[in-house]
Amino acid sequence: MADSGDKSQGMRPPPFDSRGHPLPRRASPDKSITLENHRLARDTSSRVTSSSALGVTESQPQLKSSPTRRNSSGESEPTNWFNQSNRNPAAAFHDESHIMEVDPPFYQKETDSSNEESRYPPGRNPVHPPGGVQLPGFRPVAAHSSAADDYRSVIDDLTVENKRLKEELKRYKQFGSDVMRKEKLFEIKVHGLPRRKKRELEATLRDFAASLGDSSESTSQRRKTGRHGTAVHSSGVSLSKHDSSSSSRSRPVDSAYNSMSTGRSSHAPHSSGPSLGRPSLTRAKSVGTQKVENYLRDTPDGLLPHHIVMTDKEKKKLVVRRLEQLFTGKISGRNMQRNQSMPSMDAPLAPEGTNMAPPRPPPEGLREACIQLQDGDNPRKNRSSKDNGSASNSGGDQTELGGTGTGSGDGSGSGGRTGNNTSPPGAIAPDQRPTRPRDLDPDRVQIPSENMDYIRHLGLVSPEFLQGSRTSYQDVAPDAEGWVYLNLLCNLAQLHMVNVTPSFIRQAVSEKSTKFQLSADGRKIRWRGGTDGTKFSSDSSEDKSQQSPMTEDTEDGSDKNGRRKKRKTQQASSEIGRFGPSRSPSDTFHYKPMFVHRNSSSIETSLEESMSQGSEDAVDESNMGNSKWDFSGSGTTQQRRKRRYDGAIVYYTGAPFCTDLSGDPGDMSPTAQMTAGREVEGSGSGDEVEHVLQRTLSGSSLPIRPLSDDRARVAEVLDFDPGNPPELVADDGSSPNDEDFVFPWCEDPAKVRIQPIAKEVMEPSGLGGVLPDDHFVMLVTTRRVVRPILQRQLSRSTTSEDTAEFIAERLAAIRTSSPLPPRSHRLTVAPLQVEYVSGQFRRLNPAPLPPPAIFYPPFSTDSSWDDGDDLASDDEEVEEVEEDSYSEGQISRRANPHFSDNNTYMRKDDLAFDTETDVRMDSDDNRLSDSGHNMRAMMPRAEAVDGDDSPLAAVTGKEVDMLHTGSSVATAGGAESGYSSSMEDVSSS
C-alpha cells in the first residue's frame, strides 16, 4: 500500500463506479506529455530571448555521450539559428557538442510518447528524465515561432528563381542533331536584328562555313593524290556524297562489313604474292582508329527505317513502282534520280585541261559465292557479272576472253557497261568480295536481265537452257512465257520492306498499272510494258524524260563509251565548280523535320519522297528559299508561333546549311533565295519593305469590310467607281439592258399609263375546286422612292443614340427598382421604300370547256376499230384516238374527283387492246404524269379580295402563269359537262 501511495502522490484519486472500480478516463492536464512539451518550448524560448537581450550566455551542459539527435545550445528562434550558423559556420562541424546541429529549425519532431520512448533507452530520455527532473540546456524540438513564417516567402521566391534558372539552362543547352555535334563550328545569337539583315548574316556565315570544309577537303585530297598517286581505288566517274569529309580525317568508302572483313581490301594497292588476301597496314590502322558510328554514313537511305503513314492509294503506287523497278531497272516518279544510289568514287578526278584518264581499278570478285564451276578450262568465263548489279567494277573488265561482255555494276548497281577486255590473261580476280550495304539498297539502279536470271535461278527455268534462245540482255522478259510467281516477288526486298500481302499487290496492279498481266488464278504475273514504267499524275513532267545512268549505258553501244565518259566527266566538273571539289559528309545527316504539317491540297506523297533526299536537292530545298515543306531560308521548321526567347544559330564545318533554333515568326514567309555574293532573287528594289499578309480574326485577308465600312473607303481599296458601276455580265457573255426589267422607272407618277393587257386564253387545268369563272387579272401600280445617302447616315446615327438611351433607361429602372416604363420603338425606314399607288381588279370571260373526249368501248359493234383503211386515212384522227382511249377513267377521276370510281373506271377484263396500243398508252401516260408534276398553284378566288384598292389585293397582284398541259381535260367544277362518264356515251349511242 505504501508503494501505491507513493505512485499516487500528487494525483487526484480517480472516481469509482457503483461496484468500486475506477472509471477509465484520461490523465489530468498536468500529466499530459503534449502540453508539457509546449510548456517546455515556451519557457525555453522566453529564457533565450531574455538572455540574448542582456548579453548573457547561458551555460550549456556537455553531454558527449548523449545519443540525442540535436545537442544544441537551446536557441529555438529561427533568427538566432541563422545568425549563429552564418557567423560561425565551422563551429557546428568542429565542436563535438554541435556535431548534429546542422538542420534548420523548421524540422518538426514528433512528440508522440510512444515514439519518444522507443528512440531512447528507459530512463535516458533527455527531455523527460526520470523523476520529473528537467535538464535546462536542451532545446525543445517543437518550437513554434512567428519568425518561421518570414522565411516561407523567401523559400517560395527561391523556388521560382530556381525554376527560371533551370529553364534558362535548358535553353542554353539546346543543340541540333547529336550526330552533328562533333562537326559544330560556331554558334551565334541574334538580338534585335531585323529579319532581312538576319537572313543576310545567315547566308554570309553559311557560305563561310561551307568554304572551310571545301578548303580542308581539297587539302586532304591533294595529300592523298601525292602520297598514293599510283594507288587504285574503287572506280566510277561521277561524284558521290560519301567521297568527302568535313575535316582532314579520312574514312573508308565501304561499310563496316567490308572494312572489318579479312578478305582482300578494294582500296589496297594491287599486288600479288602471299599478301593478296590481307589489307594493307595503312588501311588496318585507319580502320582501328575510327568509330563504329562513322560506318553508318555509308548505309543507304533505302535500308534505314522510315515510319511513314501512307494511305492505301499511296501504298499501291509504291508497290507498282517497286514491281516495275524489277523489270525496267528504273524507279519512275518525280524523285527517280534522287533516290537511286549513285556509284562511289574514292579516287580524285584528273585536273581540267589534261588528257590523263582516271586510274583503272583492279579486278574484283563477285558478290555471290561460286559454288561449282561449269567450265574447268576457263574458270573466269562464268565469273562475269551475276551479282544483280552490285559489283564494284564499272569499267567492264570482267568480260569473257576474246570478245565483249556485260560488265557488272558499281556499288549501287548503276554500271552495266560494255567494253573490250584489256586486262592481262593471267590476272585472275579473287573468288568473292564482301557484301556492302549499297548492294542491298532497294533504291539502286538494277539490271532487268540479271533480275530475271536471279528469279529463274530460284526454281522457274535454269538459265543455261535459255542461252540459245536469248539474244540480247535488253529483253526484259527473256523466257518464252514471261510468267513469274507473284509470291516469289513478294519475298524480294523491294516489296518485302513495304510489308504488303499478295492480295494487296494484285489489287494494286489491277488498279494502278496497265503494264502487268495477272494470270487467271492470280498466282502469276508477267510484264507487258516494255522498258518504261507507269507514269502517275503525281509525277512531275521533268522526270518523265529522264533516264537512269544504267539504262543509258546499256542502250548505248561500245563505240559511245568514250563520249559517255567525257560527258559525265564534264558534268562532274561542273558540279565541283558549284559545290566545291567534294560534298560534306554531313549531307547524309541533313536535318529532316520530325513533324511536317502539310496542306490537304498538296500533291500526293510517296515513300521515296519521305526518305532521305539527295544531298544537292535537300540542301537547295530546305536551305534556300521555299522548300516543298514550306520552310524558311535557314533550314528552320515550319511556320509557327513566335517564341518567348531567341535561340542560337549553329553552323557546322563544311556544311552549306545551319541550324536556327530560334526560327522565324509565324507571319514570316520568305519568297526569295538569299546568298552572300548575289542580290536577293525575286525581290524588287532594296528599299522595298516586305509585305506581310494580315488576316482578321475570321480569317479574311481583305483589308476592308464591305458590309460595314464606308462606301468611299471600299471603292478606294477595290478601285471601284460608285458613280459608274460596272455592267453585270451573264454567263453567256450578254449584259442585261433596261428593257429586260419588269418595272420601268418613272419620274412623274401622275402620268403613269397602264399598258393594255393582251388577251390570253386560259388553258383548262385539272386542279380541283377551280371553276371556269376563275379568270381575272390584277393590275397594281407601285412607286419606289430612293432616300438620299445623308438621310441614311442620319438614321444610322439615330439608331446608336436610341441604343444609348435604352441602356440609360434600363440602368435607371434597376437603380430605382421601379418597373420599366413602356418605350416606344421606332421603326427603321428602309433605304428603298415601295409605295402602292393603285390597284385594279378585272374579271375576264370564263374559260371555254374542252371538247368532248372520244372513246370506243370494247363491246361496241362498230367495226371501225379494226378497219385499217379508215385509221390510216387521217393521221390526226389516229393520234386523237390513241390519246383519248388509253385511260379515260383515270382522266375523268383526275378532272372530276366528285364522281365515284365505279363510273370512271372500266373492268380490267373488258379492256382488250393490241400490243402496239398498250405500248403507246404507256408512253403517253409517262408524258402526262411528268406534266402533272410541273403544275403550279393558281391565284385564290376573286371573292377573297376585299376590294380593288385594298393592300392585300395590291400585294397579291401577280400575273398568273398558265400551265399548258397539252391534253384536252375538262375543268373541274360544280356544273356537269356531260362528258365525265363513259357510260353516258354508251347510252347515247
From Swiss-Prot:
Cell compartment(s), UniProt: Nucleus
Feature: compositional bias, Low complexity: 233-255
GO biological process entries: circadian rhythm; regulation of DNA-templated transcription
UniProt keywords, alphabetically: Biological rhythms, Nucleus, Phosphoprotein, Transcription, Transcription regulation
Superkingdom assignment: Eukaryota
Basic and acidic residues biased stretches: 36-45, 109-119, 377-386, 433-444
Induction field: By light; perhaps through white collar-1 (wc-1) and white collar-2 (wc-2). Also activated directly by wc-1 and wc-2.
Post-translational modification remark: Progressive phosphorylation during the late circadian day and early night. Phosphorylation is also involved in regulating frq degradation. Phosphorylation by CKII may have at least three functions; it decreases the stability of frq, reduces the protein complex formation between frq and the white collar proteins, and is important for the closing of the Neurospora circadian negative feedback loop.
GO cellular component, one term: cytoplasm
Modification Phosphothreonine occurs at: T501
Stated family: Belongs to the FRQ family.
Protein name, entry field: Frequency clock protein
